[in-house]
Amino acid sequence: MSYYAFEGLIPVVHPDAFVHPSAVLIGDVIVGAGVYIGPLASLRGDYGRLILEAGSNLQDGCIMHGYCDTDTIVHENGHIGHGAILHGCVVGRDALVGMNSVIMDGAVIGEESIVAAMSFVKAGFQGEARQLLVGSPARVLRQVTDQELYWKRLNTKEYQDLAIRCRTGLSETKPLTQVEENRPRLKGTTDVKPKSAQ
């Protein structure tokens, strides 16, 4: 694991969280219970405080950072998709930030909201609960439906379960040189499907 103290501040990681060995946590970072942090995530707590609350996830290649005297927060069960950037913002409880989205300083994503993939949320945006945000710059398209929120929660549950699975089932290894006969497929825990398959 890549943990670095910075000017006396040491990252805090709950023992029930999973942090991939290639992720980097620097300084003022606080990671709650059941959190999943994916490969190559960068959490630079060298200016502002970075907080991932219980049950949230920060997937592969995500970046968290913020200015001095600010908190960048992903609240409980927040879901941050691959490659997203969070800078000095707040992501509400049970909200989802889609892949490769950018959330800027002082922005607040309301609880149970969804930010569509590739969206850009401008600095200072103040969201409300259950908003679907789309575009660059992001605009409120409509309210999140019950079906969309259910789908989001299933995906978040998958990552909460993945944190548990990775703590016991992930190990560094050498690759095989050929595909074995009857190679098994991995399964999730919730049977969640991509939105395109619904």
Swiss-Prot record:
<keyword id="KW-0677">Repeat</keyword>
<dbReference type="InterPro" id="IPR050484">
    <property type="entry name" value="Transf_Hexapept/Carb_Anhydrase"/>
</dbReference>
<feature type="compositionally biased region" description="Basic and acidic residues">
    <location>
        <begin position="180"/>
        <end position="198"/>
    </location>
</feature>
<comment type="function">
    <text>Overproduction of CaiE stimulates the activity of CaiB and CaiD.</text>
</comment>
<keyword id="KW-0808">Transferase</keyword>
<protein>
    <recommendedName>
        <fullName>Carnitine operon protein CaiE</fullName>
    </recommendedName>
</protein>
<dbReference type="GO" id="GO:0009437">
    <property type="term" value="P:carnitine metabolic process"/>
</dbReference>
<dbReference type="Pfam" id="PF00132">
    <property type="entry name" value="Hexapep"/>
</dbReference>
<dbReference type="InterPro" id="IPR011004">
    <property type="entry name" value="Trimer_LpxA-like_sf"/>
</dbReference>
<comment type="pathway">
    <text>Amine and polyamine metabolism; carnitine metabolism.</text>
</comment>
<dbReference type="GO" id="GO:0016740">
    <property type="term" value="F:transferase activity"/>
</dbReference>
<dbReference type="InterPro" id="IPR001451">
    <property type="entry name" value="Hexapep"/>
</dbReference>
<dbReference type="InterPro" id="IPR023446">
    <property type="entry name" value="CaiE"/>
</dbReference>
<comment type="similarity">
    <text>Belongs to the transferase hexapeptide repeat family.</text>
</comment>
<feature type="region of interest" description="Disordered">
    <location>
        <begin position="179"/>
        <end position="198"/>
    </location>
</feature>
